């Protein structure tokens, strides 16, 4: 597998990047990877720690930001992170290419019928009118091999475009997607919230295709922890998952405060966030941050049928007791 061939170097790099973090602290510490957007429970923990009885009192979190899920998979496999945001495909690739053993302990967001679906945009005056027109073009994606790559690649192949040969695929973080498109650095680029809302309000871009066209009800991001870390520190991870559960409840119960929290993390204006966040046109969220293992299994099966993964059973990612919601 092409992605797997990069694991030794990538995982070693991840370990070096985080090796300087000291583990000698009075309270037990979890090293957690995060990204943007759509991790409201973790944003609450980061920006409103006083709202969580255990956080900073019985345990600490060392937060490290990444551009996407694939680099966090590498860091987990290298032992440089204990828990991190993951997508089903990136986590599965970690198992295949990095011998990663992990538990899915919570879920952040999924695509729901009628809600937001990650999409690829082009400029209004672009000659690109359909997916087949992407041949020979430069296309931006947040992270190659990350959560959006699977359905993106499948959709292109279905329309006669080989994502490895027919396009120039470049990594463009969600936060700079709009600028990359408007400045002509890419011909098409992925859009996620709140950056999609900002681009749509400004005008001059149009949707080419969305991931829901290939894979409805995608589980986009979940929370995973290294199995060895969980098995060695079950009470510590339980406390963390309790706070993930509580963070999701707080995010959904107090939208006004959540708008402020997300604005602080994403540096996005509240009026932009207010157009979609926690509304019908947003992603879906389970109120208890519970993972939808059935939906994740369906995604793994689809990736297997597409030749992207070996056959994989989601049961390997289930811990018998440490999984959201935890009270």
Language-model segments: residues:
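Short, glycine-/small- and polar/acidic-enriched structural segments
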Residues: 27-161, 168-171, 187-193, 217
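Bacterial N-terminal signal peptides
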Residues: 10-20
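Bacterial N-terminal signal peptides that target proteins for export
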Residues: 1-11
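Conserved C-terminal helix/tail region of periplasmic/extracytoplasmic solute-binding proteins
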Residues: 300-327
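Soluble non-cytosolic domains of exported or imported proteins
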Residues: 66-70, 85, 142, 146-147, ...
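Sec/Tat signal peptide C-region and signal peptidase I cleavage site
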Residues: 21-26
């Amino acid at each position: 597998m092409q992605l797997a061939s990069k694991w030794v170097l990538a995982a070693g790099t991840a370990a070096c990047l985080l090796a300087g973090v000291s583990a000698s602290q009075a309270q037990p510490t979890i090293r957690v990877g995060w990204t943007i957007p759509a991790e409201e429970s973790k944003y609450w923990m980061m920006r409103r720690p006083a709202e969580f009885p255990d956080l900073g009192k019985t345990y600490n979190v060392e937060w490290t930001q990444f551009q996407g899920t694939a680099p966090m998979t590498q860091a987990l496999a290298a032992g440089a992170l204990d828990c991190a945001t993951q997508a089903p495909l990136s986590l599965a690739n970690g198992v295949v290419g990095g011998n990663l053993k992990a538990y899915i302990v919570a879920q952040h967001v999924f695509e729901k019928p009628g809600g937001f679906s990650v999409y690829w945009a082009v400029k209004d005056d672009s000659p690109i009118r359909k997916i087949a027109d992407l041949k020979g073009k430069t296309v931006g994606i947040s992270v190659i091999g990350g959560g959006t790559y699977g359905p993106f690649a499948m959709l292109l192949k279905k329309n006669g475009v080989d994502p490895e040969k027919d396009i120039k695929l470049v990594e463009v973080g969600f936060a700079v997607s709009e600028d990359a498109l408007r400045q002509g650095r890419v011909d098409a680029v992925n859009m996620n919230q709140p950056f999609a809302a900002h681009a749509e309000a400004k005008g001059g871009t149009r949707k080419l295709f969305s991931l829901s066209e290939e894979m409805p009800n995608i589980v986009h991001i979940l929370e995973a922890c290294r199995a060895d870390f969980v098995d060695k520190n079950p009470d510590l991870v339980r406390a963390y998952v309790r706070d993930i559960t509580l963070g999701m409840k707080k995010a959904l119960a107090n939208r006004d405060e959540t708008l402020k929290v997300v604005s602080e993390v994403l540096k996005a204006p509240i009026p932009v966030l207010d157009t979609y966040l926690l509304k019908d046109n947003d992603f879906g969220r389970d109120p208890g941050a519970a993972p939808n293992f059935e939906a994740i299994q369906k995604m793994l099966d689809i990736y297997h049928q597409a030749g992207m993964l070996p056959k994989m059973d989601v049961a390997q990612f289930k811990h018998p007791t440490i999984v959201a919601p935890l009270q």
